[in-house]
């Protein structure tokens, strides 16, 4: 049986992602430079599509970093007519960084920022949620 060429598969999947806003590209470049793990454009676009398909209005994200995945979810929520994406991160500087990116993208108005331990923030935030995205260890 032939081996899977993962780079060919990855390149194909990347080719399916529509052009991204300059701010998202800036976030991707920052992540690469700092070696900060993000979901990347293929997974981001997939999350966006899932949120759009189910008409998600309430999304809770556990472990949001500097807001890359939040940006994809917030885009979907905006296009779904509004709602809220809960961004959680334990570091206030990272939360401020995320707020800056999401403001630049015009999506901050649908994001609630939590500077807290993610699971505890989830416990304290009333649901229901259409999506709970777990991006923590």
Region roles according to the model:
Residues 9-12, 31-33, 85-87, 104-106:
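N-terminal start-of-chain detector that recognizes signal peptides
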């Amino acid at each position: 049986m032939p081996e899977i060429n993962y780079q060919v598969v990855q390149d194909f999947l990347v080719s399916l992602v529509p052009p991204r806003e300059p701010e998202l590209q800036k976030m991707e470049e920052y992540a690469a430079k700092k070696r900060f793990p993000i979901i990347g454009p293929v997974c981001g676009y997939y999350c966006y599509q899932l949120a759009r398909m189910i008409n998600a209005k309430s999304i809770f994200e556990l472990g949001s970093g500097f807001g890359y995945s939040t940006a994809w979810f917030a885009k979907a929520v905006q296009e779904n007519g509004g709602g809220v994406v809960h961004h959680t991160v334990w570091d206030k500087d990272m939360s401020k960084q995320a707020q800056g990116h999401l403001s630049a993208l015009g999506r901050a108005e649908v994001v609630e920022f939590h500077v807290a331990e993610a699971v505890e923030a989830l416990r304290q935030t009333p649901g229901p949620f259409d999506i709970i995205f777990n991006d923590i260890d």
